[in-house]
A protein has these predicted regions:
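A solvent-exposed interaction/effector surface
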Residues: 1-174
Length: 174
């Protein structure tokens, strides 16, 4: 079956640095912990120094440990120069320059259905696109398999803004 995904593969020209907060959770508690962390981060996100504009927010779930627990990260993109300057109360998630990423744009109409469409895109990426691509996941190199990127764009000829969701998959040649 041919994949219907639109996938762009390219090495990162510069490091992408995301500063935020994370928590350790497991599959049983992620639906309680995730929204709580989002509310908490929403209250302190304006304190993040050197945020990149336009604003890009990231969500990443790191690879699980042997006991099934994993780190769930939420943060905003900051300037590359901020990577070497830790900020108290926050941690950084860094995608180094040269990292090969596959970018999948996730189309959706209603914001409430974004998570469902992201899950479908992930499944299609791993089951259809990746095996036939000549690439493999590089999650072991960076500690997470993908990053959800949320940003907004203006609609043409309107003042309204639309949320855009992209998935970044960290890959390498097989």
């Amino acid at each position: 079956m041919a994949s219907k995904l639109s996938v762009e593969v390219a090495p990162l020209g510069h490091a992408r640095v995301f500063r935020g907060r994370s928590l350790i959770t497991d599959d049983a508690r992620v639906f309680e912990d995730g929204p709580r962390r989002a509310r908490e981060f929403g209250g302190v996100r304006n304190d993040v120094a050197e945020r990149e504009m336009p604003l890009v927010s990231a969500v990443a779930a790191c690879e699980p440990s042997e006991d099934g627990r994993y780190r769930y990260f939420m943060g905003d993109e900051v300037r590359e120069s901020a990577a070497g300057k830790p900020q108290e109360g926050f941690e950084d998630l860094v995608l180094p320059a040269g990292t090969i990423v596959a970018v999948v744009h996730v189309p959706f109409r209603l914001q409430a259905s974004a998570a469902l469409h992201a899950a479908q895109a992930r499944r299609s990426f791993y089951e259809d696109w990746l095996p036939a691509s000549g690439y493999e996941s590089a999650a072991d190199e960076v500690g997470f398999s993908d990053v959800e990127l949320y940003h907004y764009r203006r609609r043409r000829f309107r003042r309204a803004r639309k949320m855009v969701l992209d998935l970044l998959f960290v890959i390498r040649r097989a």
